[in-house]
Curated annotation (Swiss-Prot):
Key words of the record: ATP-binding, Ligase, Metal-binding, Nucleotide-binding, Queuosine biosynthesis, Zinc
UniProt family annotation: Belongs to the QueC family.
Cofactors: Zn(2+)
One of the GO BP terms on file: queuosine biosynthetic process
InterPro entries in the record: QueC, Rossmann-like_a/b/a_fold
GO MF term set: ATP binding; ligase activity, forming carbon-nitrogen bonds; zinc ion binding
Binding site for ATP: F10, S11, G12, G13, Q14, D15, S16, T17, T18, C19, L20
Record gene name: queC
Function: Catalyzes the ATP-dependent conversion of 7-carboxy-7-deazaguanine (CDG) to 7-cyano-7-deazaguanine (preQ(0)).
Record-annotated membrane-spanning stretches: none
Catalytic activity: 7-carboxy-7-deazaguanine + NH4(+) + ATP = 7-cyano-7-deazaguanine + ADP + phosphate + H2O + H(+)
A Pfam family assignment: QueC
Protein's name in the database: 7-cyano-7-deazaguanine synthase
Binding site for Zn(2+): C188, C197, C200, C203
Length: 219
């Protein structure tokens, strides 16, 4: 297994950017892969491109526009408004069926062609917002499936799996990239960079985590 190279599933948001710089500390070569799935917050791809260009990281954007045809949701459809809070039953309408399944599968195909075994993704079960494809059991299951499907030894690493947003901010701080994550990323479902719209679930989670992180710094 090649332990010197890694591929990061990179959206240009807080979590994946933190993982990207975490990976840069641990691996000699890091490649970022992003996806265009006709997301309304497509500005995140510009953030991803800018970050990779600025910090000299090889970057690829793969076309997954068909995802919008298969799974209508509030992140890709202009006629569906993002839920401001999680529903009592079921998943939020911002959940894109099959997104992480497809992202990781396509990245695995890409990784094998590059002779890379390690795939890094910023999913978290602690702050998973009701998304079933952010759970540890899903990642472990998919890891086994990909290994069997391609007769190849992949290792999917999830640095944020068991930490919350405040701890993710602390990780960025410890890595020396707090300002990069705070100012140059896009987490907002409404496509507003940095602090975002302040109203969508992603912005609320990000802000709540940052306020908790600030309390930690003051202690």
């Amino acid at each position: 297994m090649n332990k010197e190279k890694a591929i990061v599933v990179f959206s240009g948001g807080q979590d994946s950017t933190t993982c990207l710089f975490w990976a840069k500390k641990k691996y000699k070569e890091v490649i970022a892969v992003s996806f265009d799935y006709n997301q309304k917050h497509k500005l995140e791809l510009d953030c991803a491109k800018d970050i990779c260009k600025k910090y000299n990281i090889e970057h690829h954007i793969l076309d997954l526009n068909l995802l919008n045809q298969l799974a209508p949701n509030s992140l890709t459809r202009q006629d569906i408004t993002v839920d401001k809070s999680a529903p009592k039953e079921g998943v939020p309408n911002s959940f894109v069926d099959g997104r992480n399944l497809l992202f990781l599968s396509f990245v695995a195909v890409f990784a094998k062609q590059k002779g890379i075994n390690t795939i890094i993704t910023g999913v978290s079960q602690s702050d998973f917002s009701g998304y079933p494809d952010c759970r540890d059991v899903f990642i472990k299951s998919l890891n086994v499936t990909l290994n069997l499907a391609m007769d190849y030894e992949f290792e999917i690493i999830t640095p944020l799996m068991w930490i919350n947003k405040a701890e993710t901010w602390k990780m960025a701080y410890d890595l020396g990239v707090l300002d990069i994550v705070k100012e140059e990323t896009l987490t907002c479902y409404n496509g507003i960079k940095a602090d975002g719209c302040g109203e969508c679930p992603a912005c609320n989670l990000r802000k709540k985590g940052y306020l908790e992180f600030e309390k930690y710094l003051m202690n």
